[in-house]
Amino acid sequence: MKLTCVMIVAVLFLTTWTFVTADDSRYGLKNLFPKARHEMKNPEASKLNKRDECYPPGTFCGIKPGLCCSAICLSFVCISFDF
């Protein structure tokens, strides 16, 4: 019974926290569609086409293997295989 009450309070707290910290999305779709139409007319304006520079082999890649040009990060260093 005690565990059930604790779980209910935790769920209510997390639910209210989500609503309090969420962005105001009332006008989200209103601003989204004109931007999408502009990106269809000008594909260069799309943020999805922009990619950060990739790291060459032998450089430190940390814990993000997607930053390597070869997409292989082994022991925190970008590596490449030449076939």
Swiss-Prot record:
Modified residues (4-hydroxyproline): P56, P65
An MF annotation (GO) of this entry: toxin activity
Disulfide bond residue pairs: C54-C69, C61-C73, C68-C78
Signal peptide extent: 1-22
InterPro entries membership: Conotoxin, Conotoxin_d-typ_CS, Conotoxin_omega-typ_CS
One cellular component (GO) term of this entry: extracellular region
Residue numbers covered by the propeptide annotation in the UniProt entry: 23-49
Cell compartment(s), UniProt: Secreted
Matches recorded under Pfam families: Conotoxin
Tissue: Expressed by the venom duct.
Alphabetized UniProt keyword annotations: Cleavage on pair of basic residues, Disulfide bond, Hydroxylation, Ion channel impairing toxin, Knottin, Neurotoxin, Presynaptic neurotoxin, Secreted, Signal, Toxin, Voltage-gated sodium channel impairing toxin
Annotated function: Delta-conotoxins bind to site 6 of voltage-gated sodium channels (Nav) and inhibit the inactivation process.
Domain notes: The presence of a 'disulfide through disulfide knot' structurally defines this protein as a knottin.
UniProt family annotation: Belongs to the conotoxin O1 superfamily.
The protein, known as: Delta-conotoxin-like MVIC
Source species: Conus magus
